[in-house]
């Protein structure tokens, strides 16, 4: 709290009738019909949003106000991960306002968030779309169905840290619906389906509005921005003329999906049908997950051994942010029989790179196609961006010290040789045991730990072996130093992309560290 407990009540400029919620002066957002303030739930100790809507003379009688209150208060029963939590509401008869307490999203609405983060991949937009549609399926499945009627990017809110998207302003939509007179329509013309103007509509008006939301997210253009007033928008909408922004959608799949959303009501798909559309279906959560974790690697149990050329496209990566630096990613592979297998693994944005993780995954899962590495790496980059738009992937090529450090640690290399054919680069993984060279000295060897007297012949052999092994180590170290110098100089002569491709084909572990 910004002041001591004795003065805490002075921070609030208004308190709800129960004394539980206190409103601050800070305004989080403003709309045509409401203002949203920062508020505090004293019982739970959490910040909330205090939505205050000014009522007009359409609610002149107490019966009208009570009817409105009952309709809005029913929203408290709505509980879904894609719907903003609605805590309580009440009517202030003295000031003619209705107040709604909801959860607060400090990242703002989706329109503000999209303007702030220009570089959002299509995959992130698909994830947001799925969440919105899942919320609409929930609303539309009620009996009678709950229709939002004023869905737009301004009424969809996002938690930037988690990538959560939730539909909001349902209470305001209900108020506006109740406020309609016989011959007037209150809403946002750019997002209103043609049938809304005729006041003969169903849940599909929300699908139309969702399509316009997606159009705005893709193009950064408000629908029908070519029009100068609401009358022009009305004429275009009722005449079936699509917004000019649709022409700026260059991806044919995206455009086709948006057109399905804003089609004539007789041809428009429901939210449930859209979730099954091929455009979004590949991102649907699989209920038969086969997952495992390894502290220092990735377990391939349950994963297909190899992807054919036709199956590369049936590979996806999904993620969920767990803390400030860690995102748990899920690699999903579909085999030739159509069976889906998943593997979950942590990705630390501070220490991991998509390229090194992709290389290790391909090796662990025995995926031999070089294309799989770049495909997985790009998917990981895209997924991380969907959770952290400001994240910058680590790129290749750096100072000589990093190269020297990596080359001087042969344990990081997977192959037994470099292109030169020298096999001394090969080094066993930790715990490899008997995979080591039979001539390498071992700390637990009988040679070094044998007890008791030793005969003269054995002693001579031991002495000569120690001398030979010492000389061998010195020669190997000298060759390593020569190779370090040769490889370092060699890599300097080529662009980063060429070096990266070469390291991919060599299947070198930690290749990002080699070059960054």
Swiss-Prot record:
EC nos: 2.7.11.1
Region (Disordered) location: 426-451
Coiled coil: 457-490
Residues holding ATP: 102-105, 152
Catalyzed reactions per annotation: L-seryl-[protein] + ATP = O-phospho-L-seryl-[protein] + ADP + H(+); L-threonyl-[protein] + ATP = O-phospho-L-threonyl-[protein] + ADP + H(+)
SUPFAM superfamilies recorded: Protein kinase-like (PK-like)
Domain Protein kinase: 22-280
Amino acid composition bias (Polar residues), ranges on this chain: 442-451
Pfam family membership, one: OSR1_C
GO molecular-function terms, A-Z: ATP binding; protein kinase activity; protein serine kinase activity; protein serine/threonine kinase activity
Keywords, in A-Z order: ATP-binding, Coiled coil, Kinase, Nucleotide-binding, Serine/threonine-protein kinase, Transferase
Sequence intervals crossing the membrane: none
Residues at the catalytic site: 169 (proton acceptor)
PANTHER family membership: SERINE/THREONINE-PROTEIN KINASE WNK WITH NO LYSINE -RELATED
Similarity comment: family membership: Belongs to the protein kinase superfamily. Ser/Thr protein kinase family. WNK subfamily.
Role description: May regulate flowering time by modulating the photoperiod pathway.
Protein name: Probable serine/threonine-protein kinase WNK3
């Amino acid at each position: 709290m910004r002041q001591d407990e004795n003065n805490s009540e002075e921070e609030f400029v208004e308190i709800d009738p129960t004394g539980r919620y206190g409103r601050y002066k800070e305004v989080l957002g403003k709309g045509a019909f409401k203002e949203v303030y920062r508020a505090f739930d004293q019982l739970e100790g959490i910040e909330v949003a205090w939505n205050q809507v000014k009522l007009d003379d359409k609610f002149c009688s107490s019966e009208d106000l009570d009817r409105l209150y009952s309709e809005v208060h029913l929203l408290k029963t709505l509980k879904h991960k894609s719907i903003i939590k609605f805590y309580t509401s009440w009517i202030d008869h003295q000031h003619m306002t209705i107040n709604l307490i909801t959860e607060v999203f400090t990242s703002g609405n989706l329109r503000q968030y999209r303007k702030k983060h220009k570089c959002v991949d299509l995959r992130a937009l698909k994830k947001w779309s799925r969440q919105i549609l899942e919320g609409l399926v929930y609303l539309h499945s009620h009996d009678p169905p709950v229709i939002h009627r004023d869905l737009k990017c301004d009424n969809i809110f996002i938690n930037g840290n988690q990538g959560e998207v939730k539909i909001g302003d349902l209470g305001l939509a209900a108020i506006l619906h109740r406020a309609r007179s016989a011959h007037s329509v209150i809403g946002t013309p750019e997002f209103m389906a043609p049938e809304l103007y005729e006041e003969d509509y169903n849940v599909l008006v929300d699908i139309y509005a969702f399509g316009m939301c997606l159009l705005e997210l893709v193009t950064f253009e408000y629908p029908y921005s070519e029009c100068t007033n609401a009358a022009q928008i009305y004429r275009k909408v009722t005449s079936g003329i699509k917004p000019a922004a649709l022409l700026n959608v260059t991806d044919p799949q995206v455009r086709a999906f948006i057109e399905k959303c804003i089609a004539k009501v007789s041809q428009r798909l429901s939210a449930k049908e859209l979730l099954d559309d091929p455009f979004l279906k590949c991102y649907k959560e699989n209920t038969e997950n086969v997952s495992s974790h390894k502290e220092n690697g990735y377990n391939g149990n349950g994963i297909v051994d190899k992807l054919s050329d036709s199956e590369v496209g049936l590979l996806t990566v999904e993620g969920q942010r767990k803390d400030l630096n860690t995102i748990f990613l899920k690699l999903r592979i579909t085999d030739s029989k159509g069976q889906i297998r998943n593997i979950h693994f942590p990705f630390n944005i501070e220490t991991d790179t998509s390229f090194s993780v992709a290389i290790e995954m391909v090796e662990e899962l025995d995926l031999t196609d070089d294309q799989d590495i770049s495909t997985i790496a790009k998917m990981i980059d895209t997924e991380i961006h969907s959770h952290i738009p400001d994240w910058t992937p680590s790129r290749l090529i750096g100072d000589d010290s990093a190269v020297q450090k990596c080359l001087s640690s042969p344990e990081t290399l997977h192959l037994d040789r470099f292109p030169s054919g020298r096999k001394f680069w090969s080094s066993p993984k930790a715990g490899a045991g008997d995979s080591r060279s039979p001539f390498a000295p071992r700390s637990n060897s009988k040679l070094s730990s044998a007890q008791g007297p030793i005969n003269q012949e054995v002693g001579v052999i031991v002495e000569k072996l120690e001398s030979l092994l010492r000389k061998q180590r010195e020669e190997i170290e000298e060759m390593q130093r020569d190779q370090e110098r040769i490889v370092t100089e060699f890599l300097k002569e080529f662009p980063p992309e060429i070096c990266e491709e070469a390291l991919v084909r060599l299947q070198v572990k930690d290749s990002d560290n080699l070059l960054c």
